[in-house]
């Protein structure tokens, strides 16, 4: 870490080191940026082959599963969602019949239920009452060799879980068969999966994960990429990072060290090619949105007031380490906090504290991400008005909502030209904060679009998002899905910046 002497008081509450003023003197807004997604924070959908070397790669942390008793033809269920017994009496599955895996080893798991307790052994049978998993909440999932969705559960006592009746599930079965009449046999259905940083590092385990991650960091983004980006008109990169970077080189397991060195390299390369850097805290400890890219273990959003101090500490680490870098443009405090799980009150407390932490080291811009879900980005305006050099971050995708599924190409373009332009215009005012469209892409919910269609859609977004006062950042630079990859889009003449 680098600590600089304080020089002057700014805005009554902010202190800046002397070098910080020169730092942003050459910052030209608006920025034309691209996100270096799936580099320092894993998003498996962007390059699925990264997971190919994991044994039982379909059973990673956070995989949501359901189990049908072959004998009873009923689903296992955590009665009342948890806090009591496990039964096998549901004819169809829903929330209480869905379990989230915590991976202990290649074949051993904890099963977390709807109310967040763990399935375990009890005196009256199998129950879901423990808030913390121990050996008695750990089960080996034994899969049939020629039918991987046919499973049995070996408990810590060495015996198998069985559905004796619809209301009695025990772990006392010693027989071994795969017949439908066997009460210990269940049909596994995978409902949802996560492929984030926790999943890939815990999936490979402590022996393999360090090398797997290092190889990825060294190859996925290189100096040549910064040369390419700069040569094609980009002025900045937005780099997602996870909370574990602050504990390099020995972050808590299963995360592995090395991401801070990769980020160091990015700053050096960016400076060489005349580019600025936005550091984006994409993954906060306890997860601010439950998505895989937040570093979540099992998809539960659990970030709250109790996590504010440790999240501020991550921001302070970033500001201390990179605040002296002349090409630091901004630090984004938290990516996509989701409402109502993350309350405005908690977020405001965090944003205030994180802003103050940054101002100990640098006058770089501070970016406040708008909440996802039922929240208005303008809810941050009053907070932003008390701060200096801040921007509000909004993300615009013509995806992830049923409202886009039936749109024609022209309707997608019209939506950008009309609705998105209106949304962006409402956030832009002479006295308000700057605005960053921190994520957007040229993909939409069409599988019949032509090259010209994509070109028109991309151009419409460039025209509209070009009005954002802080700038925009395309998602992403490198991706297996072509239209999500700005590098591919440029190389194949689908977009002109």
PLM feature segments, named:
Residues 60-192:
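Lectin-like carbohydrate-binding module/patch detector with strong preference for beta-trefoil
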Residues 63, 210-211, 215-235, 252-282, ...:
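An active-site-proximal structural segment forming one wall of the substrate-binding cleft
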Residues 236, 240-242:
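Mobile, glycine-rich extracellular loop/lid and propeptide segments
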Residues 16-63, 158, 189-234:
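N-terminal carbohydrate-binding accessory modules
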Residues 28, 191, 287-446, 462-463, ...:
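Active-site region of glycoside hydrolase catalytic domains
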Residues 2-22:
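Cleavable N-terminal signal peptides of Sec/SRP-targeted secreted and luminal proteins
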């Amino acid at each position: 870490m680098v600590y600089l002497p304080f020089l002057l008081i700014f805005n009554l509450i902010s202190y800046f080191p002397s070098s910080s003023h020169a730092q942003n003197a050459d910052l030209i807004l608006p920025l034309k940026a691209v996100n270096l997604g799936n580099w320092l924070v894993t998003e498996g959908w962007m390059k699925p082959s990264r997971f190919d070397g994991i044994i039982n790669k379909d059973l990673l942390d956070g995989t949501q599963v359901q189990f049908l008793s072959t004998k009873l033809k009923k689903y296992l269920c955590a009665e009342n969602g948890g806090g009591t017994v496990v039964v096998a009496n549901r004819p169809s599955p829903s929330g209480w019949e869905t379990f989230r895996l915590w991976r202990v080893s290649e074949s051993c798991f904890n099963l977390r239920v709807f109310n967040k307790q763990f399935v375990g052994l009890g005196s009256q049978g199998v129950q879901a009452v423990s808030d913390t998993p121990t050996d008695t909440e750990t089960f080996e999932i034994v899969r049939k060799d020629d039918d991987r969705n046919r499973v049995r559960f070996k408990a810590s006592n060495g015996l198998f879980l069985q559905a004796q009746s619809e209301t009695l599930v025990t772990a006392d079965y010693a027989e071994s068969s795969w017949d439908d009449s066997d009460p210990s046999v269940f049909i596994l259905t995978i409902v949802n999966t996560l492929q984030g940083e926790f999943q890939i590092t815990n999936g490979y385990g402590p022996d393999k994960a360090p090398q797997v991650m290092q190889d990825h960091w060294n190859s996925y983004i290189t100096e040549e990429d910064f040369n390419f980006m700069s040569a094609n008109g980009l002025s900045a990169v937005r780099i997602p990072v996870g909370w574990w970077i602050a504990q390099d080189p020995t972050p808590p397991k299963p995360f592995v060290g090395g991401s801070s060195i990769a980020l160091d390299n990015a700053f050096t390369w960016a400076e060489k090619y005349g580019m600025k850097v936005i550091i984006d805290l994409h993954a906060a400890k306890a997860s601010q949105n439950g998505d895989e890219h937040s570093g979540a273990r099992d998809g539960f959003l659990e970030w709250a007031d109790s996590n504010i101090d440790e999240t501020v500490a991550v921001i302070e680490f970033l500001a201390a380490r990179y605040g002296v870098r002349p090409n630091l443009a901004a630090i984004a405090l938290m990516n996509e906090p989701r409402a109502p799980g993350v309350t405005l009150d908690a977020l405001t407390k965090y944003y205030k504290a994180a802003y103050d932490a940054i101002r100990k080291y640098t006058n770089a811009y501070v970016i406040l991400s708008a909440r996802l879900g039922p929240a208005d980005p303008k809810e941050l305006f009053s907070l932003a008005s008390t701060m200096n050099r801040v921007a509000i971050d909004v993300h615009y995708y013509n995806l992830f909502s049923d409202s886009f599924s039936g749109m024609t190409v022209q309707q997608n373009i019209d939506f950008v030209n009309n609705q998105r332009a209106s949304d962006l215009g409402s956030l832009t005012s002479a006295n308000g904060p700057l605005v960053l469209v921190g994520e957007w892409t040229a993909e939409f919910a069409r599988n019949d679009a032509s090259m010209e269609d994509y070109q028109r859609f991309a151009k419409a977004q460039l025209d509209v998002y070009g009005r954002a006062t802080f700038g925009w950042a395309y998602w992403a630079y490198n991706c297996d899905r072509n239209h999500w990859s700005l590098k591919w889009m440029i190389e194949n003449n689908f977009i002109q910046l």
